[in-house]
Amino acid sequence: MSLLEDLQWRYAAKKMNGEQIPQEKLDYILEAARLAPSSSGLQPYKVFVISNRELLAKIKDVAWGQSQVIDCSHLLVFAAWDGYSNERVSEVFNYTMDERGLPHSTMDDYKNNILGLYEPLGKEWQADHAAKQSYISFAMAIAAAAEQKV
């Protein structure tokens, strides 16, 4: 099937069917979200997978009582950063350099350029920007879920 056919298959479920999503399909969806492009490569969000029934019930209370929240197999929560701090940006760069086996200082100039660009824009702009980046990842997860017929 093509991407367009997968997306045409996709729909907003109003009632869940009670089936558990197989772990391999969930992993595929999460990997698509992880591989999503983001501005400056920072991925300024975290994706939480929630399947604990008690926690889902609490989330339902603040999600306008939507039954899908409690009836789903897994709930993915995309939590965007509330700002671009030196600590957060450094953590991303350090992780990347560790994965590549390079010294942390390898991309210091680029990291400092990013911080110099984002910091003066203020916390409200930063939070809005991070939220927009999380939407891109969310869209990739939706496309992957459609491909997996979830």
What are these regions (language model features)?
Residues 1-150:
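Acidic, surface-exposed loops and disordered segments
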